[in-house]
Amino acid sequence: VITGMGALSPIGNDVKTTWENALKGVNGIDKITRIDTEPYSVHLAGELKNFNIEDHIDKKEARRMDRFTQYAIVAAREAVKDAQLDINENTADRIGVWIGSGIGGMETFEIAHKQLMDKGPRRVSPFFVPMLIPDMATGQVSIDLGAKGPNGATVTACATGTNSIGEAFKIVQRGDADAMITGGTEAPITHMAIAGFSASRALSTNDDIETACRPFQEGRDGFVMGEGAGILVIESLESAQARGANIYAEIVGYGTTGDAYHITAPAPEGEGGSRAMQAAMDDAGIEPKDVQYLNAHGTSTPVGDLNEVKAIKNTFGEAAKHLKVSSTKSMTGHLLGATGGIEAIFSALSIKDSKIAPTIHAVTPDPECDLDIVPNEAQDLDITYAMSNSLGFGGHNAVLVFK
């Protein structure tokens, strides 16, 4: 069960603000301020707003962490506080951390490479490697909170956050931990990341903040980068009940598959994603007709969105006609490894509050993407089961089912 949540996103620096803004259809995408984008064909991203790390972490400590790790610590602290989870010498061994990042310390790499080229190897920081590696979000969060249980990191590109939560879910289900602090974090608004994703033609080159990220719409031309972190505290029902914890929702199913097809393009007809959705429903012991809401991967790429729609139709059959399918990336942008964490929060809160966040910028529907995408305005709906999809470069497909 999910007992705590923490978020940093382009539409809010905590869960409450992020969820309220998602339901209002707030657009978190704007001109990039972090770097000078004049040399690039991409000028928009979903950046954090009015966020100062020194409000949360000592300046000296923060300088020894890449942004992706800083974000994870802030969101993890919020989640643990929200869960009222007491991590002490009696409980620490049974509380683990499993937080992923898709690309790790990209900014750290850029800075160190410049130092190496300009001033030689002796000027590279001894903190370079510990700041760079993607597992360091988990490492630093476990140190910060004192959690000594199962500890690791999953890296599956854009599926990272969802895979991380799925793996943590299985750790708790097996009885290897009473609680896990889990999710995803990412800080990709850097020169190398923007240049690299631009070179692979994955990013939108549209400079209009209202139309750059428009999942399932005609004219979509790529995703818009976002940054932040989404962290959950999940624990066994017994553990939550024993301490009288507030329960948001239950994770009941997890499916993960590989396309074995192409490094960036999805398999034809969304075959791999379809199998992951089916695996998650099988794990939950439910059928397509049982699911009311699906938080789609929906990144606003021409091929990706269409393939996901085909995968949903192939998996759900007739039930797809009655399924609500929204892409919250229309508001947040694509947070890469963090996106599964944020979207798990949206999925759980949609169940708790009986509300679905919309797909904004839905003004020119693609006739081939003919699902109910909850256009432009939030909707009220009693939800028994919600699903969240994440599909990553490398052919990674991860799906969670919430109750």
UniProtKB/Swiss-Prot annotation:
Pathway: Lipid metabolism; fatty acid biosynthesis. Residues 1-403 form the Ketosynthase family 3 (KS3) domain. Its EC number is 2.3.1.179. The active site is at C158, H297, H334. InterPro entries: 3-oxoacyl-ACP_synth-2, Beta-ketoacyl_synthase, Ketoacyl_synth_AS, Ketoacyl_synth_C, Ketoacyl_synth_N, PKS_Beta-ketoAc_synthase_dom, Thiolase-like. It comes from the Bacteria. It catalyses: a fatty acyl-[ACP] + malonyl-[ACP] + H(+) = a 3-oxoacyl-[ACP] + holo-[ACP] + CO2; (9Z)-hexadecenoyl-[ACP] + malonyl-[ACP] + H(+) = 3-oxo-(11Z)-octadecenoyl-[ACP] + holo-[ACP] + CO2. The keyword Cell inner membrane does not apply. Gene3D superfamilies: 3.40.47.10. Keywords: Acyltransferase, Fatty acid biosynthesis, Fatty acid metabolism, Lipid biosynthesis, Lipid metabolism, Transferase. It is an enzyme of class 2 (transferase). GO terms for cellular component: cytosol. Involved in the type II fatty acid elongation cycle. Catalyzes the elongation of a wide range of acyl-ACP by the addition of two carbons from malonyl-ACP to an acyl acceptor. Can efficiently catalyze the conversion of palmitoleoyl-ACP (cis-hexadec-9-enoyl-ACP) to cis-vaccenoyl-ACP (cis-octadec-11-enoyl-ACP), an essential step in the thermal regulation of fatty acid composition. Belongs to the thiolase-like superfamily. Beta-ketoacyl-ACP synthases family. This is 3-oxoacyl-[acyl-carrier-protein] synthase 2.
